[in-house]
Every structure is written in C-alpha cells, then in structure tokens.
UniProtKB/Swiss-Prot annotation:
It is an enzyme of class 7 (translocase). The gene is ABCC1. This is Multidrug resistance-associated protein 1. Its EC number is 7.6.2.2, 7.6.2.3. GO terms for biological process: cyclic nucleotide transport; glutathione transmembrane transport; leukotriene transport; lipid transport; positive regulation of inflammatory response; response to xenobiotic stimulus; xenobiotic transport. Residues 325-608, 974-1255 form the ABC transmembrane type-1 domain. Residues 55-74, 122-133, 194-316, 385-440, 486-547, 612-966, 1046-1088, 1132-1202, 1247-1530 are cytoplasmic. ATP 2 binds at G1326, R1327, T1328, G1329, A1330, G1331, K1332, S1333.
Length: 1530
C-alpha cells in the first residue's frame, strides 16, 4: 500500500500487475514501476559505485588531461541533464502551487535524478583531472540509464497512440529531451579522450594503444585489431611490436617482488636483515634500515644468516600479485553465477514450447535473454582471462628478474650446488609453470562452487536422485587424489632428469671443440641419451597416468548423468524423464563437466608449480656473498695510506670446507706493484678472489681503498663487439681508448679483424685466440681506470715479448697503470726485479714477503724457487748462441737484459719468458692510428657479423611440419588415434540423440514404456565412450613419447654432427633453448593440445549436426556463420603464429645473456657493474614480453569474436525453435538448444586449441630447423677405413694445402707444401694471425681444406672418416676443458682402458700423488668445467689423456702457455721421454721449448716463410733469427 500511495494520490496506480506486464500479448510496465524502479536503478548504481571509484581515482593518478571538445561536450550535457531533471521538479512545485494534488514520486524521482546527474558531471571532471581517458563506470551508467529510459519511451509512445489517452505534454517533452541527452552521452562515452599531459607514452615511438583505447574497445579488445590486420597482410616483425605498458615492465614488477621477499626473509630469521646493494657508492651504509623506495628497489636480494624457518615464497607471490588475483576473483565469481542462467532459460524455453497458449513474444524474450546472457558471459569471462594472463606474465617477469639478481650475489659454494642448467631451468621452465598456473588458480574455488551450484539446481530438477551422481563424484575423489600425488612424484623426477640433461648439454656446447678434437661425440651422446631415457621412462609413466585421468574425467559427468537418471526412473514408476528434466539436467551436467575436467588439470598445474616453487625458494634462499667481509674505503680517505690492508685473515670457499687461505697478513701502499708467486694450487688466485669478497671470510680484517678492476686467469669475453668489450659500459674517450688499445698490443689484431674494433666477438670469444682474449680482458680493466688492479696471470696466454710490451706499457713502473696499486699473480720471474714487493705463497699461506733483493738475500723459499728453474733450464740444454755465464746459487752477478736489471740466476728464465713467435714490440710501435682507423670497414656487415641471432620463420606453419610430427609418432598410432576419437564422438552424439527419443516417449497411465531398454542402451553407449576415450588418450600419449624420443635424437645427433663453424655462429642460448623450452613443449604440451584440439573439433562438428537435425532451418545460418568463423580464425592465426615465433626468438637472448653473466659474474661484481647487467637482463625480458603480450591479447580478441559467432548460433537455434514450436517436439528443442549452448565453449576451445596447436608445433619446426643444418663429413666411412695400426710411421705431408674459414672469406693458409717424417719433432711459430692454429684445425679436419691435401702415412685424410682420423692423432689443447663427471670419465669416456693403464698415465702426467690423495681416487667428481681443479691440474689431466691414447702423432697447441713454469717443465719433460718415437707438432709461444726440435716451420700471413732446423734457420738470419734475437736467444 505504501508504494501505491507514493506513486498516486488515490492509490490507484499499482506498483506491479501481472496481467499488464506478463500475461498479455502486449506487455508494459505500470506507471508506478516506471517512475520508481526505472528511475532509481541507474541512480542507485552510480551512488553505490561512487565511493569505491573515488577512492580508486585518488590512488591512481595518470596525469592531467586538458579540456577537449569531447570533455566540454560531456560536461555541458551533464549540466543540461541536471537542468532537465530540475525543470521536471520545478514543474511539479508549480503544479502544487496551482492547487493540484501530486504524488510524492513526482518530487522525489526528479530530485534524485537531478543530484545523480550533478554527481555524473562531477565524476567527468574528476576523471579528467586524474587522467582517465575512457571510463567504464560512466559508460555503464549511461547504458543503464538509456535502457531504463527506453522502456519508459516505449510505454509513452504506446500511450500516445491510444485514442483516449491523457497526455502530460510538459513531462513528455522533458522526458524526450532527457532521453536524447542520455543517448548522446552514451555515444560520447564510447570515445576516448586525449592522452594526459606529461604522459610517458608521448615520447614513446611505438606506444601500446591499450592505454588510450576507449572502454568499449578495451572490453572487446578492439584496440589490437590494427596489429591483427597488419599481421594478416604481411608477417609481423619485431619493429611492429608495441612498447610494454609501464606497469608490466621489469622495472615496475621485479623490485616489488624482491622487496617483499626481503621482508619475508627478515621475518623468518633471527638476525636483522642485511641488504645487498648494487649501488656503486662505496660509502652506502650496508644494512641500513632507513632506505627510500628507490633504494629498496635497487636492493638485489636479502642475506639472512640464521635460520628459524624457511621463508615462504608463496606468501611473497601472493602479497605481490594478490590484488590482480582479487580482480580476477570478482570477474570469475560473476561469470560462474551467470553460467547457470543458460540452463534456467532453457527450462523456460522448453516450457514455452510445451505451452501452446503462451504469448509468442515470451519465446522471443527468452531467446533475447539467452543471447544477452551469453554475450555478457563472453565479455566477463575474457576480462577475467586477460587479467589472469597479464598476472601470469608479470609473475614470470618478476621470477626471472629475481633469479637473475640472485645469481649476481650468490656465494660460490651455493653456485656449485645450483648448476647453470638448473638456474636456466628456473628461468625457462619453472617461471613458465607459474605463468600457466595463473590462468587456472581461481579454479581451486571456482570449480567446487560450480559443482555445488549445479548439484543444487539438479536437486531442484530431479530431487534426491542426484545423490547417486554425488556418490559417483565422491568415489572419484580418492582416485584423483592418488593420481595427483603420483603426478607430483613423476614431476619431481622429470625435472631432476631435465636439469641433469640441460647441465650436460650446456657443458657439451661449451666444450664442443674439445669433443670434436678427441672424437668423443658418441660417448657424450650416449651419456645424454641415458639421462633422456630416464626422463622418457618418467614421461611414459605420466602418460599412463594421464590416460587413466582422461578416462575418469571424461566418464565422470556421463556416469553422474547415467546414475542420476537410472535412480530417478527406477525408484518410482511415476517419475517421468521428460524433455525439460532431461535437457536442463544435461545442460547442468555439461556445466559440471568443465570443473570436473579442469580440476585434475589445475591439480596437475598446482603440483608442477609447487615443485617449481620449492626449487625457486631453495635457490633464492641460498646464501649470498657478504659484501661486509671487505671494508671498502673511498680513494680520497686521508686516514689510510695503504691501498690494501689484510690482517690475520682466513678464507674458505664454502662455510663447511676447510680454509683455503690461513692467517694472511700484508699491506700494499698506494701505487705499489706487487707480485704474487708460488707453486700450482698454493692459493694465488684464491688470494685475489678473497680481496674481491668472492670467498667466505672466517676471521680477520680486510680493507680495500678505492675502486677495483680485475683480470681473471681465464679471460671472460662477451658476445658483443671488441670495442664494447673494452669500454664495458663506459663512455668512449677517444685518446685514452687508443692509448689503451696500443698499450695492450691489440693494434696488429685490429688489422687482422674484418671490421677492426667493431668486429663482433662470438660467444666466449670463439673467434679470438687465447692471447687475444687475455689482452681484451686486460684492456677492459685498464680502460675502466680503477684505483686497484688485481691481475691473475694476464701475461701467461700471450707471446713472451708481447708480454714484455704489455708489462712495459701497462703494468710496469712506466706503464699506463704506474700510479695505480697493482697485484700481479705471475709465473714470469723475469719481471720480478721490477716489483716493489713480492708475496710468496705456499700451501694457502704467505711464506715470504719483501722486495726482490730482500728475498734473494734471505736465501729462503723464493731463492730456492729461482735456483730450481735456473737449473731446470741448464738441464734442458742451451741453444748454441744462448747467453753464457750462470752464476752460482745465490750469487748476484748482474747483467742488463732488455732494459731490466736482473740477477744472472734469473737470466735464463728471462730468456725463456721473453722468447716468442712474433715481434709485437716492433709492430706496435709502428702503429699511430686514430680510432676512426681502428674501425676498419669490412667487406659487408654480414662478413664480420659472426653470431647469428635466433631467426623467426614467417608465414603459415608448413603442412610438412605436421607430417614430420606424425611420422615421428608413427603413422599407425596417428591414424588409430583419429579413428578412436571419431568412435568416441559418434557414441556421444548417438547417446544424446537416444536421450531425446527417450524423453519424447509417450506417457501411458502416468508412466513411460521401454524405460529399461532406453536406460540399458544409454548406459552401453556411455561405456563405449569410456573405452574409446581410454584408447585415444593412451594412443596420443604414447605417440607423443615416440615423437619426443625421435625428435630429440635427431636434434642431438645433428647438433653433434654439425661443423665447428655452426657453433661459432650459433649462440649457445639458442641451442639450450631448443633442448630445454622447445623440447619441453614437445614432451608435455603438444600431446595434451592434440587431445584437446581433436576433442573440440569433433564436438563442434557434432553440435552442428544435432542443430541441423533438430531445426533444418539452421542450414541457412550455419554456413555464413561458419564462413565468419573461418575468416576470423585465419585472420588471427596469421598474427598469432608470428607473435609466437617472435616470442620464441626473443627468448633465446634472455638465456644467452644469463649464461654469459654466470660465466663472468666475478668480473661483473669486481667492476661493480651489477646494475648495468640487471638493466640489460630486464630489457631483454621486456623485449620478450613485448611479443608475448600482444599474443595473449590476440587470443582474447579472437575468443570474444568467436564466442559472438557461437552466441549467434544460440540465438538462431532458439529463434528457429520458437518459430517452429508447433512442429517440433520438446525433446528435439531441448537437444538442439542444449547443444547450441555448448557450441560457444566448443568454438572457443577449437580455435584456442588450433592456435595452440600451431603455436606449439612451432617447437617441432624449431627443433627440425637445427636437425637439418649442414653436417661435417661422415665420422666413419666403411669402405675407406684405414688399417687398425695406422699410422705406423707418423709421416705427415702437406701438398699445396690451403684453408679458409668461410667461403666468403680469404684463404688463411696458402700453398703449404711440407713433409714431416715419422718421429720428427717440429715447432710451428709465427705472429698472431699467421695461421699456426689453422694448421692444426686443418690437420684434425675441424676446418676442411679449400685446396690441396694432407697425407698421413700414404693415406689422404680427406678420404677417411673424421673419427678414424681424430682417434689416431692426439692434441693437448690450449684451453684445458674438463666435463662434470668422474676423473676417469674425463680421461677415458669410452672405458677402453684398464684402471692400471689409467693410473700409469696419471703417474707419467705427475698427477698420481694428487689423485691418490683424493677420497674417491679415479671416481673423484669433477665440477662443471673442472672448476674444482686448478688450471695447471686441468692441463696435466689433458696430458694424461694424450698419454693414455699414445698415438703416433701428437699436437701441442700452445699447451703450456697458460700454466706456470713448474707445470710447463713437467709437461715438456714427459713429452720428451714418453713421445720419443712419435711425431710431435708444437705451436710454440716460448721459442726455447722448440730449440732442440728437429725442424721448425715459420709461418707468416698464412704461408711458410722458413722451414728447417733451428740452427739452420738461425744461420739464415731471416724471420726466425729476428724472433730469436727479440727473445734474447741469440
């Protein structure tokens, strides 16, 4: 009564009247309803949203938008609307003043509407000031207002058309004005305003249009259409990609995760937290709690010493990304509730078809309702998916960023526990797992909610019978739980095998040259395949489990339906299974199918993510290096006169290991030159590492004053140009740069390089010699102009007088660094007299310290050290024209040699150190070059660009790729799978059609006949579905494993068969990417996608068949809709495919850069370049996400459009059912509409899966890409196999031999004609680039000859297999490479030799004592790259390999250049005795080592200049003589 009085004076105006609104052929709302509800609904919406929206705007300021015509128009219209509403109000007041009685509604509604319009105008201005370009809240408000006004408009028009109607002219006119203004406001709200002032997108050359897109464009994903059109017309390139939105960049995402992880670590530890800063400010207080936001963002990761509990990474991820998931939660909840609208409307539609008296408009109303409901579901669902995918992308970005930052600060001990392979997997596979989970995580609560709601509605429909279905589901729970537990076990085992395989592949790729030289490819291939076999075993078990899982998931909804229907019809004869009950229940069962199907997938995804979560937590919880172990002081600190002060310090590599350095005490005054000398493994390199804070300080105090530069023993070179390697992120200062390059003896090298200092250096410096790499490493340190220089034996890898040049011009008292503090680890005793201080190390302690003269006078360990080497020289014999007069022990007979005052005791060592194969000191002095000349132009950019970026294929994935995959599976299994799929879906269709026939059975005496028959056949069809499901699931899973095995085998075999040039130009990141990410896709993703694709395809075909059978009129509409569908799908796939390829290609640099960083992490830390490398990594990740982000939006773009096509099928199926209701049975209507309701989902899944299929099959394409590259010559040729005892003599002939590195480059060796008799010892000398190493590459056929031939014992080596050749000759390479595994495996990977033979070789290589002392002896595990052995010990292992093989021909490629004098002596003496009857070819740096050789080859510019015995060549006074003279040998 209250509302009646509120709406009319006499209470005659009812609020609601069924006969007016519903039970009529011409429905309308009552006046009261129009004046209250239809006015109040839009007002209520805006007032409810206002406080939340205002709060949101207060916290999200995007900048200020200037007043535009659009904004002025919206504001003006807002005021006009307010005026119109209040005009209505004032008109009411005027009427009352005229004595007319008015109901309160005429005062309240205009007042409320007027105030709401003012609020709307206020919000329009607030949005403008906060930078909102298009508002969803306001657009929705205007839409609701218009829809409500539309109902009123229809009513007013209908009233006006009546003859006896009373018309209120003023209110009607104001309403028409109001309606027009609201309509214009709605239209204006569809457009976006201009960008805010000072917006970051203004300066962006290619901003993402999303930020400036209108609300409508955003919810329909229209803003990406431009890229889709472009991608359809021509393949997308990386330049076409838009910049990432600021909130998605690493710069925004990573620091938040790192900060939250830091807080979580702090909570889980007892001690206060310590922050590791990447700041370069040495005065920054460590562990300070008062840090601003920016500083916190720069904190790399947290060091937390004492454990209480493990920090929870899950909590951290939740805290960081929780708000995004809350948004997705809201969208998902709305969507889930809307899902159940379909079955309820279907129930009403079936009732309508059954009720022939119902007004016609109700059928059209239900159809419209079904369509609108489906469209709203579509928009809500894809906003949800978009949020999930973007959140997943951000999680991946954050995880990669956190792992990278952690890798920069992790201790060396922790680094050893996490191999490169494992860390790369954390970035590739584990980060991806989190990304995948983000999409499904809401299903944890959503799936049970959907199940509960479906069961509730089923209870209303079928009563207690539904409990039978619940019982079936409950029975399935323990089965699913067991499978989930098993899945986790298999997942852990799979990840472990994968880590081991990637680790081994990494090592193989890093040491590929050594593998080829030793012909060890097959041994390592077997090792990889053994690990792969374990991996495939686990995959096979997972496949069986997946088949059982698929069987239960597909069968569960059917079993639930069958058991429910069976109980329903059998418990009571009067229970009739009519169309409404059956098909509404079926629609609900179909809703039930999705959560039941997806839950196991979600569980599996959660299991995988939990494994990854644990791995990631363990890695991020590893201990960090303690930067406080070294006290850093600014260079201007007047209080400290010493640059380095160490007091009673003890250091260890790992907390639990015994100390490596004990009781170290010394100080170095500013500007001093200090040498660190000692035997192999005495702790020289460790001392430098300790000063770099790379070791754990157990006790003591260490102070370093000023900035530090570090040159490691093994040079670390980046895959960038030579110039960029030297500049290392610093500005180019041309004069100083030129001075550095000249001082480091790099000018002659720049002459040789195709593009001077702009030449790109391959990964790990593959296109530079060892000496060149070391000089570039030194130049980098010199150019950075630091205060303290830690130089770890930088002169060992260079020619001796290049060493002299570098010492004089860089390190020595007159060099570029003369005013700097220098700590030089060296084996070159000729430089020792010029040192200010010499530190003698022994057994991890400082045994002596003092100046050269002081140490000699003491006649202690240092004097003994010098005497040992002087006598060693004497024993080896003197060259004819050598220096005479060696004084007695300790006798200081002085002489001048090369401008250095040295004792005679050291004189012979000096001869040895300064002897060389080239004359750099002269060469360098002749170069006076500007940096413009250093940038010598190469023939073409391609000629000098060595490393190929990962390329993206373009265009459609070729059918041949699918065919290749089918062949890899096996054609029988492929066709069997398709046949089983077909059988399964035929059974499914027939069972549903059978159900419709059942529901149409006539009712006789309150019951249906043939119920038992109907039920039995229905059950039998269900069982046949189950059997075929299990069959196809098994077939696809097992076929997938066959394909994985075959594709991996082909890839591995081909990569190992590729020539060395392939590895030089292919970054290892590309190959690691193939063996990790792409192979993981083939292992896990493709079989799953095939099952889903085939299922979706048959579902769509089946649904169309049913709709056509039920309503033949649909034949008119299905073909055009199919055409639209096909067009949209092709449109999408063209762009999606290319985006996936671009994403794949941009992923490789992320891993390559990460690999590079891990190898050079100590250098990066020493130079304090962490920030720059973090920025580079972030940039590469962002580049990768730039391709990924459009691909996820494209997915949504497609889904929205396809679902609209699906919704049209729902609309027409319902419409035709309404039109044909008099000729259709309720059963067929139910069947048709229930299938049409599913079509949307099926279409969506079909396109999603077809695009997933195409984007994932790209992995096969990329694997095949490297399976079909060029191959080197066959390893074995049966017809041309040499005799088993070949070569017997060891005679080597070069006949007019020529060699070039690539077809488009000049010859590096020309017209080589030389014969080396068996048993001869031949030295090969020449300056850098003369072709010395090229000669050995030719001998081993690492590079094939361009002309001429090499004959060994009358056999042309080009005619025999590569392994036949390489097994018969042995090399001791310049870089000693070891692989992780046992020491025995490193010596004899094929297990050809007995333990006795191995021990003999170790004894002869002077390693027996060392190996015998190891706990595991021959089974001692070598670390990755042999890092747990010193360089000298590694070189001796290489010697032991040679002794074990004992071939007739031995090649030494500068094998003793990188070792100390003692190791050099050991190697030389062993070679002289053990290889006495062998042909020995030695590429020599130190001329004295070859002075007793039979003959010497002198190479220059790729040609033999001189050839003869050393004495003959000295008498000729040619090139060799000048070298010997430079070296002080004559």
């Amino acid at each position: 009564m209250a509302l009646r009085d509120f709406c009319s004076v006499d209470g005659s105006d009812l609020f609601w009247e069924w006969n007016v609104t519903w039970n009529t052929s011409n429905p309308d709302f009552t006046k009261c309803f129009q004046n209250t509800v239809l006015v109040w609904v839009p007002c209520s919406y805006l007032w409810v949203c206002f406080p939340f929206y205002f709060l949101y705007l207060s916290h999200h300021d995007r900048g200020y938008i200037q007043m535009t015509h659009l904004n002025k128009a919206k504001t003006a219209l807002g005021f006009l609307l307010w005026i119109v509403c209040w005009a209505d109000l004032f008109y009411s007041f005027w009427e009352r003043s005229m004595g007319k009685l008015l109901a309160p509604v005429f005062l309240v509604s205009p007042t409320l509407l007027g105030i709401t319009m003012l609020l709307a105008t206020f919000l329009i201005q607030i949005e403008r000031r906060r930078g909102v370009q298009s508002s969803g809240i306001m657009l929705t408000f205007w839409l609701i207002a218009l829809l409500c006004a539309l109902a009123i408009l229809r009513s007013k028009i209908m009233t006006a058309l009546k003859e006896d109607a009373r018309v209120d002219v003023f209110r009607d006119v104001t309403f028409y004005i109001y309606f027009s203004l609201v309509l214009i406001q709605l239209v204006l709200s569809c457009f976006s305003d201009r960008s805010p002032l000072f917006s970051e997108t203004i300066n962006d050359p290619n901003p993402c249009p999303e930020s400036s897109a209108s609300f409508l464009s955003r919810i329909t994903f229209w803003w990406i259409t431009g890229m889709m059109v472009q991608g359809y017309r021509q393949p997308l390139e990386s330049t076409d990609l838009w910049s990432l939105n600021k909130e998605d960049t690493s710069e925004q995402v990573v620091p938040v995760l790192v900060k939250n992880w830091k807080k979580e670590c702090a909570k889980s530890r007892k001690q206060p937290v310590k922050i590791v800063y990447s700041s370069k400010d040495p005065a920054k207080p460590k562990g300070s709690s008062k840090v601003d936001v920016n500083e916190e963002a720069e904190a790399l990761i947290v060091k937390c010493p004492q454990k209480e509990r493990d920090p929870s990474l899950f909590k951290v991820l939740y805290k960081t990304f929780g708000p995004y998931f809350l948004m997705s939660f809201l969208f998902k909840a709305v969507h889930d509730l809307m899902m159940f609208a379909g079955p309820e409307i279907l129930k009403l539609l079936i009732n309508f078809v059954n009720d022939k008296k119902a007004p016609e408009w109700q059928g059209y109303f239900y159809t419209a309702l079904l369509f609108i409901s489906a469209c709203l579901q579509t928009l809500v669902l894809h906003q949800y998916f978009h949020i999930c995918f973007v959140s997943g992308m951000r999680i991946k970005t954050a995880v990669i960023g956190a792992v990278y930052r952690k890798a920069l600060v992790i201790t060396n001990a922790a680094r050893k526990s996490s191999t490169v392979g494992e860390i790369v997997n954390l970035m590739s596979v584990d980060a991806q797992r989190f990304m995948d989970l983000a999409t499904y995580i809401n299903m944890i609560w959503s799936a049970p909610l959907q199940v509960i709601l479906a069961l509730y509605l089923l209870w209303l429909n079928l009563g207690p019978s539904v409990l039978a279905g619940v019982a079936v589901m409950v029975l399935m729970v323990p089965l699913n739980a067991v499978m989930a537990m098993k899945t986790k076990t298999y997942q852990v085992a799979h990840m472990k095998s994968k880590d081991n395989r990637i680790k081994l592949m990494n090592e193989i790729l890093n040491g590929i040259k050594v593998l080829k030289l030793y012909a060890w490819e097959l041994a390592f291939k077997d090792k990889v395949l053994a690990i792969r076999q374990e991996e495939l075993k686990v995959l096979k078990k997972s496949a069986y489990l997946a088949a059982v899982g698929t069987f239960t998931w597909v069968c569960t909804p059917f079993l639930v339906a069958l058991s429910t229907f069976a109980v329903y019809v059998t418990v009571d004869e009067n229970n009739i299974l009519d169309a409404q009950k059956a098909f509404v229940s079926l629609a609900l069962f179909n809703i039930l199918r999705f959560p039941l199907n997806i839950l196991p997938m979600v569980i599996s995804s959660i299991v995988q993510a939990s494994v990854s979560l644990k791995r990631l937590r363990v890695f991020l919880s590893h201990e960090d290096l303690d930067p406080d172990s070294i006290q850093r002081r600014p260079i201007k600190d007047a209080g400290a006169t010493n640059s380095i002060t160490v007091k009673n310090a003890t250091f260890t590599w790992a907390r639990n290991d015994p100390p490596t350095l004990h009781g170290i005490t010394f100080s170095v005054p500013e500007g001093s030159l200090v040498a660190v000398v000692g035997q192999v493994g005495c702790g020289k390199s460790s001392l430098l590492s300790a000063l770099l804070a790379e070791m754990d300080k157990v006790e003591g105090h260490v102070t370093v004053k000023g900035s530090v530069a570090y040159v490691p023993q093994q040079a670390w070179i980046q895959n960038i140009s030579l110039r960029e390697n030297i500049l290392f992120g610093r500005q180019l200062q041309e004069r100083y740069y030129k001075a550095v390059v000249e001082a480091c003896a790099l000018l002659p090298d720049l002459e040789i390089l195709p593009s001077g200092d702009r030449t790109e250096i391959g990964e790990k410096g593959v296109n530079l010699s060892g000496g060149q790499k070391q000089r570039v490493s030194l130049a980098r340190a010199v150019y950075c102009d630091s205060d303290v220089y830690l130089l770890d034996d930088p002169l060992s890898a260079v020619d001796a007088h290049v060493g002299k040049h570098i010492f004089e011009n860089v390190i020595g008292p007159k060099g570029l660094l003369k005013n700097k503090t220098r700590l030089l680890v060296t084996h070159a005793i000729s430089y020792l007299p010029q040192m200010d201080v010499i530190i003698v190390m022994s057994g991890g302690k400082i045994s002596e310290m003092g100046s050269y003269q002081e140490l000699l006078a003491r006649d202690g360990a240092f004097a003994e050290f010098l005497r040992t080497y002087a006598s060693a020289e004497q024993e080896q014999g003197q060259p004819e024209d050598g220096l005479a007069g060696v004084g007695g022990p300790g006798k200081e007979v002085k002489q001048m040699e090369n401008g250095m005052l040295v004792t005679d005791t050291a004189g012979k060592q000096m001869q040895r150190q300064l002897s060389s194969s080239s004359s750099y000191s002269r060469d360098v002095s002749q170069h006076h070059t500007s940096t413009a000349e250093l940038r010598k132009p190469g023939p073409t950019e391609e000629t000098w660009k060595l490393v190929e970026a990962d390329k993206a294929q373009t265009g459609q994935v070729k059918l041949s790729v699918y065919w290749d995959y089918m062949k890899a599976i096996g054609l029988f299994i492929s066709f069997l799978s398709i046949f089983l799929f077909l059988c399964n879906h035929v059974a499914s269709l027939v069972s549903n059609y059978w159900l419709s026939l059942w529901t149409d059975d006539p009712i006789v005496n309150g019951t249906q006949e043939h119920t038992q028959v109907r039920l039995s056949v229905y059950g039998a069809l269900g069982i046949s579905q189950g059997i075929t499901v299990f069959g196809y699931s098994m077939a696809v899973s097992i076929g997938g494993i066959f394909a994985s095995r075959r594709l991996h085998l082909d890839l591995l075999h081909n990569v190992l068969r590729s020539p060395i040039s392939f590895f030089e130009r292919t970054p290892s990141g590309n190959l690691v990417n193939r063996f990790s990410k792409e192979l993981d896709t083939v292992d896990s993703m493709i079989p799953q996608v095939i099952k889903m694709f085939m299922g979706s395809l048959f579902n769509v075909i089946g649904a169309c068949i049913i709709i056509l059978l039920a309503t033949p009129m649909a034949a008119v509409i299905i073909p055009p809709l199919g055409l639209i569908y096909f067009f949209v799908q092709r449109f999408y796939v063209a762009s999606s495919r290319q985006l996936k390829r671009l994403e794949s290609v941009s992923r490789s640099p992320v891993y390559s850069h990460f690999n590079e960083t891990l190898l050079g992490v100590s250098v990066i830390r020493a130079f304090e370049e962490q920030e720059r490398f973090i920025r580079q990594s972030d940039l590469k990740v962002d580049e990768n996400q730039k391709a990924y982000y459009p691909s996820i939006v494209a997915n949504r773009w497609l889904a929205v459009r396809l679902e609209c096509v699906g919704n049209c099928i729902v609309l027409f199926a319902s419409l035709f059912a309404v039109i044909s209701r008099h000729s259709l049975s309720a059963g067929l209507v139910g069947l048709s509409v229930s299938y049409s309701l599913q079509v949307t989902t099926y279409l969506n899944w079909l396109v999603r899966m077809s695009s997933e299929m195409e984007t994932n099959i790209v992995a096969v394409e990329r694997l095949k890409e490297y399976s079909e590259t060029e191959k080197e010559a066959p390893w074995q040729i049966q017809d041309m196999a040499p005799p088993k005892d070949w070569p017997q003599v060891g005679r080597v002939e070069f006949r007019d031999y020529g060699l070039r590195y690539r077809e488009d480059l000049d010859l590096v060796l020309k017209h080589i004609n030389v014969t080396i008799d068996g048993g001869e010892k031949v030295g090969i000398v020449g300056r850098t680039g003369a072709g010395k190493s090229s000669l050995t590459l030719g001998l081993f056929r690492i590079k094939e000859s361009a002309e001429g031939e090499i004959i060994i014992d009358d056999i042309n080596i080009a005619k025999i297999g590569l392994h036949d050749l390489r097994f018969k000759i042995t090399i001791i390479p310049q870089d000693p490479v070891l692989f992780s595994g046992s020491l025995r495996m490193n010596l004899d990977p094929f297990s050809q030799y007995s333990d006795e033979e191995v021990w003999t070789s170790l004894e002869l290589a002077h390693l027996k004592g060392f190996v015998s002392a190891l706990p595991d002896k021959l089974n001692h595990e070598c670390a990755e790259g042999g890092e747990n052995l010193s360089v000298g010990q590694r070189q001796l292992v290489c010697l032991a390999r040679a002794l074990l093989r004992k071939t007739k021909i031995l090649v030494l490629d500068e094998a003793t250049a990188a070792v100390d004098l003692e190791t050099d002596d050991l190697i030389q003496s062993t070679i002289r005795t053990q290889f006495d009857d062998c042909t020995v070819l030695t590429i020599a740096h130190r001329l004295n080592t070859i002075m007793d050789y039979t003959r010497v080859i002198v190479l220059d510019k790729g040609e033999i200049q001189e050839w003869g015995s050393p004495s003959d060549l000295l008498q000729q006074r040619g090139l060799f003589y000048s070298m010997a003279k430079d070296s002080g040998l004559v």
